[in-house]
Amino acid sequence: TGFLGAGKTTLLRALLSSPDAADTAVIVNEFGEIGLDHHLLVGASETMYLLENGCVCCTQRDDLEASLEDLYWARLRREIPWFSRVVVETTGLADPSGVFAMVSGDTLAGIRYVWQSVVTLVDGVNGSETLEAHAAGAQQAAMADHLIISKTDLAADIGDLRRRLQILNSDARLHQASRGALGASLDALMQPAPGADARRLGLSGGPLHDAGITSCWLHFRPSLPRLEFDAAFADLTEKFGVDLLRAKGIAHFAGDPKPSVLQYVAGGTIEITPADLAADAPAGLVVIASKVSPGEVENIFVAHGLGPYLMAEDHKGHAH
């Protein structure tokens, strides 16, 4: 787990590329309506489930339990490669206590599976601000057996963040990662911290989603003009500032031979990277923001002449 844009998918892909992760099934939970993380992880695991458009700790909790049950029986029937563990990548807004309660309680998941650990990524650049401003980010850190400070290559100083994390959760093992590179294996990250389960029970108080956070999904047509997109996104960041928490998506820009992956984290700049993706990878952009309506986001793109490139969709704001 880890707050929006902390680098969960980058780290998970790196961990799954190791030979000791060959027997790992993966469940990816996405907040928005586009399963981008699922597409970025394709090939990293032979056994993968996608839970999109909701959080596993509330709207998708039943679906998570059903997916775990499906995996269990498909494994026994040899319909999928044999696995010895399941990794769940939650949304950036999820409180992991709900997943912990389900797997540790008197449920089918609790009977089939044994809980191991919570691994929480904290953005080395924005982590201190996230812990102060967002209850979900602080809860994720407090629940962790392993705390990983990510993006250390981009952070000027992580001393203050380390001190904050030690105060918030002194039991967790602290790691550092850069571009997905971590000096610990998946096996090591599955080891629980001493006394962690008792501490987690005390922290399990129900969902802590930040009020007013919404997501919207803009569906792009092919041959999206790059200059107009760049200008529209620049206006988006200028208008909403830190309230624009996260944006991620896939675009097929005019004249480019490959689709591009779009990634943005609050306070940064958008990263646009050509990528080899599956043919069915959906083109579009998920925008996750605080106190911003989907209509406001769409209007900015329309104002830059991108209206004809936006396919008609039922844009939704998901209040958590």
What are these regions (language model features)?
Residues 64, 133, 158-161:
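Amphipathic coiled-coil/heptad-repeat helices and related helical stalk/stem segments
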Residues 93, 134, 219-223:
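Conserved phosphate/pyrophosphate-binding and hydrolysis machinery centered on Walker-type P-loop NTPases
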Residues 139-280, 290-320:
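C-terminal accessory "lid"/substrate-recognition subdomains
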Residues 1, 6, 10-130:
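Nucleotide-state-sensitive switch-loop elements of NTP-binding domains
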Residues 78, 110, 136-139, 208:
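Structural motif
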Residues 113, 128-133, 140, 168-171:
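Extended, well-folded catalytic/binding cores that form a central cleft or groove in large enzyme
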Residues 287:
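Flexible loop/N-cap segments at domain edges
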